[in-house]
Swiss-Prot record:
Designated name of the protein: Respiratory supercomplex factor 1, mitochondrial
Compartment annotation: Mitochondrion membrane
Protein's organism: Verticillium alfalfae (strain VaMs.102 / ATCC MYA-4576 / FGSC 10136)
Domain of life: Eukaryota
Keyword annotations of the record: Coiled coil, Membrane, Mitochondrion, Transmembrane, Transmembrane helix
Bilayer topology annotation: Multi-pass membrane protein
Main location: mitochondrion
């Protein structure tokens, strides 16, 4: 990015205007008085022209044509003198006017460059603030996600511990009572009881049938 001193003030300026801050910030009235001091013949010629015109107007009212003509000639001479003074002053101060125009242009360029630099700095500051705000939002979001993941992983473990604690309190845990999955232990006990029962008692023989019949007859 070009610097103000390199791009705007890099060109050589006239030595008479070095460090001349009053010239850069000159007020309108100060400029008028400066022009009057630099070219005093122009206002002098303008004053003589006005004076000759007024002096010609009075003889005209009185009807003195000779005096009026003299004043008109004097007015024309004063006006010509003013024009010559303007031309001579323009030729004499041409270099200074060019320098003044150049300095005015440099001042405008410097002001515009300063405004652009301020605008760029403001944009950079806003960009940094935006980046910092986005970083804070991302950090908060990451912390919230980490906390949420930690709570989700801690909840199943706590549920398992609570369940095992209740089973131990009731004495129904798998290690103490031999219970495994629901429905497995009763089936195993029933099959074991059936296997332990004698086969003879389960089968009714003819002898047993006769014995039962005899006992029934006695009873009757």
């Amino acid at each position: 990015m070009p610097n103000v001193d390199d791009s705007v003030m890099g060109r050589q300026m006239p030595s008479s205007f070095d460090e001349n801050h009053e010239f850069y910030n000159e007020k309108p009235m100060a400029k008028i008085f400066r022009k009057l001091r630099e070219e005093p013949l122009i206002p002098l010629g303008a004053g003589l022209t006005v004076f000759a015109f007024t002096q010609a107007w009075r003889p005209m009212r009185r009807g003195d044509q000779v005096s009026a003509n003299k004043m008109f000639r004097a007015r024309v001479a004063a006006q010509g003198f003013t024009v010559l003074a303007m031309i001579a002053g323009s030729m004499y101060y041409n270099k200074d006017r060019e320098a003044t125009k150049e300095l005015r242009k440099l001042k405008e360029e410097r002001d515009s460059e300063e405004k652009r630099q301020k605008w760029i700095r403001e944009l950079e500051i806003r960009d940094e603030e935006d980046k910092a705000m986005r970083a804070r939002v991302m950090n908060r979001r990451a912390k919230a996600e980490e906390a949420k993941a930690g709570n989700a992983s801690a909840t199943p473990a706590e549920g398992g511990e609570a369940k095992s604690g209740v089973l131990n309190a009731l004495g129904l845990s798998g290690s103490s009572s031999g219970w495994g999955k629901p429905g497995e232990a009763p089936l195993a006990d029933a099959s074991k009881a059936v296997d332990d029962e004698p086969i003879v008692s389960k089968v009714k023989t003819p002898t047993n049938v006769k014995r039962v019949s005899a006992e029934d007859d006695k009873t009757n």
